[in-house]
C-alpha cells in the first residue's frame, strides 16, 4: 500500500529517522545504548540540597467505583521511579479503596463532583505532569469533568500522558489534544485502531505499523504517540523509534499503568533537562523510550521470578532494580 505523497516527501527530506532497537540483533545494541544514554542524561541527580517535590509532583486523573487498581498502579509507579509526590484525582467511591492501598498517595475524591474541574484546577499549579485515564471508565459525567481538567491543564502548559479511557475520550474528541505537543498518547493495539479510525477516517495499514504511528502523530499535530505491543513504536510525527527491550510473554492487566505513571515522571524530567541533554532529540520521545524500556525490563525481571503467575504488583516491585540496571550502570 502506498504511503501517500505527504509521507513520501517527509522521507525524501530526511526528516524521518527510523531506528529499530533489539537486544537480539548485535548491530542494534549500540543504538539501544545510545538512546538509553539520552534517558540517563535527563535523570536529575539525587541531592541533599533539594526540597520535597523538586524531583516531581505528578497527578493521576482516574479511578471510579469499578476500577481502583489502575490509578494506584500509575501513581505508585511514579513514586517508585523517583517522583517526590503523587496525587490521584478520582471518583468519591474509589477514594477509600485507593487510600487503603497505600498511605504514600495523596487522594482527592472529587472527579464525580459538580465542582471537579474547579477542585482539580486548584492543584494544577503545583503539578509537573498529569497522567489521564487509568481506571477512568466511560461515565459521561466523569468524561465531561476530565475534558475540563485537560483543557485547564493545556492552558497552564502542563504535560499530559493519556492512556486507557482517556484515549476513548480523545477518540471521541480529537480536537481536545490537537496540536498540543506536551501530550503523549499510549494506546495498545485496539486503542490505536480506534484512534486512527477516528482521526484519519479510515483503517490503519496493518502491514505498515511504523507509517501508521507516524501518520497518526502528524494528523494530531505532532503529538507524541506510543503504540504498545510486541514492540513499542514511538513517533512525534518527525521521528520514529522502536523499542524492543526484552520483556516476557506474560501480559498481565495493569502493566500499561506502570508505563503511564513512569512516563509522567520522565516527561517532567526530560522537559526540565531540555533538548541539550537529549542531543537535539525530542525530549518527549526520549522520555517515552525510557518508560517503555523500564516497563519491559520490569516485566522481564518479574517473569524470571514468578513465571506465568506474574502480576503488575510483581513488576512494580522490580522498578528500583530495573531502573538501576538500565539507567544507573
Swiss-Prot record:
Q: For the modification Phosphotyrosine, which residues carry it?
A: 67
Q: Name one GO cellular component term.
A: mitochondrion
- Record domain YjeF C-terminal: where: 35-326
Q: Where in the cell is it found?
A: Mitochondrion
Enzyme Commission (EC) number: 4.2.1.93
Pfam family, any one: Carb_kinase
Residues binding ATP are: 228-232, 247-256
Per the UniProt entry, the glycosylated residues are 207, 222, 279
Q: What is its main location?
A: mitochondrion
Provide any one GO MF term from the record: ATP-dependent NAD(P)H-hydrate dehydratase activity
Keywords annotated in UniProt: ATP-binding, Glycoprotein, Lyase, Mitochondrion, NAD, NADP, Nucleotide-binding, Phosphoprotein
Sites binding (6S)-NADPHX sit at 135, 188-194, 257
Q: Which reaction does it catalyse?
A: (6S)-NADHX + ATP = ADP + phosphate + NADH + H(+); (6S)-NADPHX + ATP = ADP + phosphate + NADPH + H(+)
Asked if the keyword Glycoprotein belongs to this entry, the reply reads yes
Extra facts: This protein may be expected to contain an N-terminal transit peptide but none has been predicted.
What PANTHER family does the record point to? Answer: ATP-DEPENDENT (S)-NAD(P)H-HYDRATE DEHYDRATASE, ATP-DEPENDENT (S)-NAD(P)H-HYDRATE DEHYDRATASE FAMILY MEMBER
Q: What does this protein do?
A: Catalyzes the dehydration of the S-form of NAD(P)HX at the expense of ATP, which is converted to ADP. Together with NAD(P)HX epimerase, which catalyzes the epimerization of the S- and R-forms, the enzyme allows the repair of both epimers of NAD(P)HX, a damaged form of NAD(P)H that is a result of enzymatic or heat-dependent hydration.
- Assigned protein family: Belongs to the NnrD/CARKD family.
User: What is the name of this protein?
Assistant: ATP-dependent (S)-NAD(P)H-hydrate dehydratase
Q: Which organism is it from?
A: Pongo abelii (Sumatran orangutan)
Source organism phylogeny: Eukaryota, Metazoa, Chordata, Craniata, Vertebrata
What gene name does this entry carry?
Answer: NAXD
Amino acid at each position: 500500500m502506498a504511503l501517500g505523497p505527504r509521507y513520501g516527501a517527509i522521507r525524501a527530506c530526511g526528516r524521518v529517522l527510523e531506528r529499530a532497537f533489539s537486544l537480539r540483533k548485535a548491530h542494534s545494541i549500540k543504538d539501544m545504548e545510545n538512546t538509553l544514554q539520552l534517558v540517563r542524561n535527563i535523570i536529575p541527580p539525587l541531592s541533599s540540597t533539594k526540597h520535597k517535590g523538586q524531583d516531581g509532583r505528578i497527578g493521576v486523573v482516574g479511578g471510579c467505583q469499578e476500577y481502583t487498581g489502575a490509578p494506584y498502579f500509575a501513581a505508585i509507579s511514579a513514586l517508585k521511579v523517583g517522583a517526590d509526590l503523587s496525587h490521584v484525582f478520582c471518583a468519591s467511591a474509589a477514594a477509600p479503596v485507593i487510600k487503603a492501598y497505600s498511605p504514600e498517595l495523596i487522594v482527592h475524591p472529587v472527579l464525580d463532583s459538580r465542582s471537579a474541574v474547579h477542585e482539580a484546577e486548584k492543584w494544577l499549579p503545583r503539578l509537573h505532569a498529569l497522567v489521564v485515564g487509568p481506571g477512568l471508565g466511560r461515565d459521561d459525567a466523569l468524561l465531561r469533568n476530565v475534558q475540563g481538567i485537560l483543557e485547564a491543564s493545556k492552558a497552564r502548559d502542563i504535560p499530559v500522558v493519556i492512556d486507557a479511557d482517556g484515549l476513548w475520550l480523545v477518540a471521541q474528541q480529537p480536537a481536545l489534544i490537537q496540536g498540543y505537543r506536551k501530550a503523549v498518547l499510549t494506546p495498545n493495539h485496539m486503542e490505536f485502531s480506534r484512534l486512527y479510525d477516528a482521526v484519519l477516517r479510515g483503517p490503519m495499514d496493518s502491514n505498515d505499523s511504523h507509517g501508521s504511528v507516524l501518520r497518526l502523530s502528524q494528523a494530531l499535530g505532532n503529538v507524541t504517540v506510543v503504540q504498545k505491543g510486541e514492540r513499542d513504536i514511538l513517533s512525534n510525527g518527525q521521528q520514529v523509534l522502536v523499542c524492543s527491550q526484552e520483556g516476557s510473554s506474560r501480559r498481565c492487566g495493569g502493566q500499561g499503568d506502570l508505563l503511564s505513571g513512569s512516563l509522567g515522571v520522565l516527561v517532567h524530567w526530560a522537559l526540565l533537562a531540555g533538548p541539550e541533554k537529549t542531543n537535539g532529540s525530542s525530549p518527549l520521545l526520549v522520555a517515552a523510550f525510557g518508560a517503555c524500556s523500564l516497563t519491559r525490563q520490569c516485566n522481564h525481571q518479574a517473569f524470571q521470578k514468578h513465571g506465568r503467575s506474574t502480576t503488575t504488583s510483581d513488576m512494580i516491585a522490580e522498578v528500583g532494580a530495573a531502573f538501576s540496571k538500565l539507567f544507573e550502570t
